[in-house]
């Protein structure tokens, strides 16, 4: 697969494991080159309930998809949908006293919000962060208008967190299968 990128995903959120491997080049749509579906054992609602069964299930699903695609994977993205997802909304404010809103202002507020959420519950790992809404001089905006003069603005973010032990157990399964997790993606 010369000059082709490979993306692989595995879905742990159902009663069946589903693994898909895609290839694509610059300017191309992804093409499915390998797929497998196996009955889940040792995993319930994206939670590892039996480590050995989970390792066997994941390994079997990966091997079948790799054979079909003729690719040996070293990294995969993991789709999860655990019932323990915690959603947190947090709004951060900034007074600008008539100066322009810049991207670094938004980045600063996001970093502060993330830090506050992490300090509030260190048992959680944030897998997704969404910008939910912006309020600029008491007016609601879907997208933040940059480079305009304002007195104050706020940014509301939504954080999706999962208990770290759930992610550690999933990581252990994939480590035992000699494959790195690229990222966790929530199906919700």
Whereabouts are the PLM-identified features?
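Nucleotide/phosphate-binding catalytic cleft detector across ATP-hydrolyzing
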Residues: 1-16, 20-76, 80-188
